[in-house]
Amino acid sequence: MADSQTQLLVLGGGPGGYPAAFEAADHGLQVTLVDEGAQPGGVCLNRGCIPSKALLHIAKLINETRESADHGLSFAPPKLDLAKLREWKNTAVVGKLTGGIRELCKLRGI
């Protein structure tokens, strides 16, 4: 591993850490961002708030289709494919957001 120098070490790549690192880098500091996970975003983005809200969104959609019968629009009962649902949550939601943070880090030299 090569020796490197940093002016600011930010511990934690969650919703407090990465914005702080971005702000410092935008002001010309050489920043290193350290996070325990392989993906930036911390617990909230990777396995907490954001994935939970994505799954709650699906639950809301299912409920709305049931309630639409009151307005004359009905659907067949939903069929959940848990493997596809998890894949969507992991790639289209979490993967897209962590990828965006990773790219923003690269652009700023973090």
Regions from the PLM with identified roles:
Residues 2-16:
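Beta1/beta-strand and adjacent pyrophosphate-binding region of the FAD-binding site
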Residues 2-5, 23-29, 35-110:
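Glycine-rich flavin
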Residues 11, 34-35:
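The conserved SAM/SAH-binding core of class I Rossmann-like methyltransferase domains
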